[in-house]
Amino acid sequence: MLEVLPIQTKLEQEAICARCGVEFKTDCMAYHALVDGNLTAVCQFTMDAEGGHIHDLAMVRDVDFSDRDRIESLFVMGRATLNFIDLCGVHVAYFEDANFEGEGMIKSIGFTKTPEGRWFVDLTDFFVEPCQHGHGLKRD
């Protein structure tokens, strides 16, 4: 069973980030994904006057996950992060993880690329009908 949960302590966040090969950022909030109780992924994010910012979305390193576990972990965690950002009253978000290699996943979560090359999503009413915002999940 897939679970996406907020990381409760900075010590835990640092350890999870290390397992996922991303830099621990003390100013970030974070979620982690688990499948059947096993850690699969992390998402670090912030919010500021510009909007929400997903800084890292990464799988645990050196573990072979099924496509299903990988796709579901990243997609559900990305959407959960956007939902939290929206519930906090921040209605735009940016995907800022330059090391993430899955453009299809970024689009599926709901982001589109601006003319300036930034991944952006307008969260106004996004979760009224979230399925309309996916751009087709394609395996990279």
Predicted regions and their residues:
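Short glycine-aromatic motifs
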Residues: 2, 28, 110-112
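Acyl-donor binding region in acyl/amide transferases
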Residues: 52-117
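Short amphipathic alpha-helix that is part of the acyltransferase structural core
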Residues: 1-25, 130-140
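Short linear motifs at secondary-structure transitions and domain/linker junctions
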Residues: 4-10, 18-20, 27-35, 67-72, ...
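Generic preference for well-ordered secondary structure
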Residues: 1-4, 17, 38-41, 77, ...
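Terminal substrate-recognition subdomain of acyl/acetyltransferases
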Residues: 32-46, 94-140
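A conserved beta-strand-loop-helix scaffold within acyl/acetyltransferase catalytic domains
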Residues: 19-60
